[in-house]
């Protein structure tokens, strides 16, 4: 069994870690960074970029650069949050045939699971490069408040990336695992997790290696992206007041504003004032326009105050569900990049009445926790038991469109609950069961996970047939349903097919595409390596020709010149085999040059030697240790 890795698939950044013995280790990517931007881009020639290279070209290629894709995962196109996102991002969000929200680049649609899979592939490659062996299994984190569709879509992303997802683990729970791994004694902790796109709060009891989640709450559409958006809107409004030009209509300018907003937000966590300078942001008939603005921390805090306040209510609900007061919480752990903001720390301190714990790296702690869970599953980490909860109530639609709860929110998972259903009409042979997740009283106001028909019920008067339906939520927080006709004891396993979601055929197709992309990437890498090698050979040959060209025959020199010209022509194209062949031809041709160099070197060496007959015998005497001492 190979290593199981832990991946924090974040909205803004992702991170991968692995257990080395009993110690978790965050792995640096190819660029030398410990986190990777969760960004995927497609260039003009169809090349796919992931991470920092994708982020770097985002300003000049906004319509094909996908960021914050996690906000769309597992959502339908009609979801109010999707509609909100459409107005915030420069790329195209489209409606998939199954009703889900997908994205599009150059007319080609991609599911959010697919885009996420490209990021997961990058994390997989990062781990493989470090470990020196293939990786096929992972633990992936999700926001605690993710529903079933979002969890399933994340699991699908892992599958598309070529990973068997052994466990989906909640981000605050992972953070608690990392925080409490070496802690002795017991206590109650609150994990306040404000990341790039989502907010979670979890209350846990920790003691003797047992991590028990008491409650969880959150908002899957609240995070750093919203803080950036507020700042972008402010900058655009200020610019419009001064210049009469609306930058929101210019995708290129908007992307530059977003980049500047993110940078300013980060700077204001340590500085009380920052300057935003964007020369040549746009132009009109009077010439180019520049954006230059001073921004104070106080102004930024005023712009986003309501967003920070939105995190307080979930904290209140989580405490209420756990049956605790703020004073009964022993420690508050901050997770997510946004918790570096002083105002956020101040609000947390006010609410919980204590200074939050800042001893963990908010960007890495979730991946570390995922690696710990991977270690538990692999048997490398002993005496750790994780008891998580389901964040949302699960139930069905009953007469009158009412939501009847079967499993309440904050129930410890895995869990199982059975309910007996019957028919509403005489001789009814089929019944439709609609499964929902949420907290509203009417089913239609909650998230429809899917529906299924029970068929083949023996004809009988209404209310007589007894069909036992069992709902079970596994350790990943994913729902499974079984149905049994109590009269015949015939059992049927039902996979909830959500109204949206990817089918097995969709996933298989995307897996094949990902494999094909990986093969294309390999060829592209080989081509770049071959070109670099060819150019290096040309450079060294031309340098040697300039130095030793006079030492080789004119015919050999002509052959070398011709080989260089042929390779240069080939390097302008994309033919890998042609480049390799022409490089080999130049290496062969330049062998004559090598011979001339060695010959010249040998001759130079001989002329430096004195004739044997002129060797002079020298007198010598032995030197004692004291003779080495020099007088000052």
From Swiss-Prot:
Biased amino acid composition, Basic and acidic residues: 609-632
Modified residues (Phosphothreonine): 198
Induction: By stress conditions e.g. heat shock.
Leader sequence residues: none
GO molecular function annotations of the record: ATP binding; ATP-dependent protein folding chaperone; unfolded protein binding
Keywords noted in UniProt: ATP-binding, Chaperone, Nucleotide-binding, Phosphoprotein, Stress response
Isomerase listed as a keyword: no
InterPro entries: ATPase_NBD (IPR043129), Chaperone_DnaK (IPR012725), Heat_shock_70_CS (IPR018181), HSP70_C_sf (IPR029048), HSP70_peptide-bd_sf (IPR029047), Hsp_70_fam (IPR013126)
Alphabetized Pfam families for the sequence: HSP70
Region (Disordered): 601-632
The keyword Nucleus is annotated on this UniProt entry: no
HAMAP family (alphabetical): DnaK (MF_00332)
Function field: Acts as a chaperone.
UniProt family annotation: Belongs to the heat shock protein 70 family.
The protein's name: Chaperone protein DnaK
Organism name: Beijerinckia indica subsp. indica (strain ATCC 9039 / DSM 1715 / NCIMB 8712)
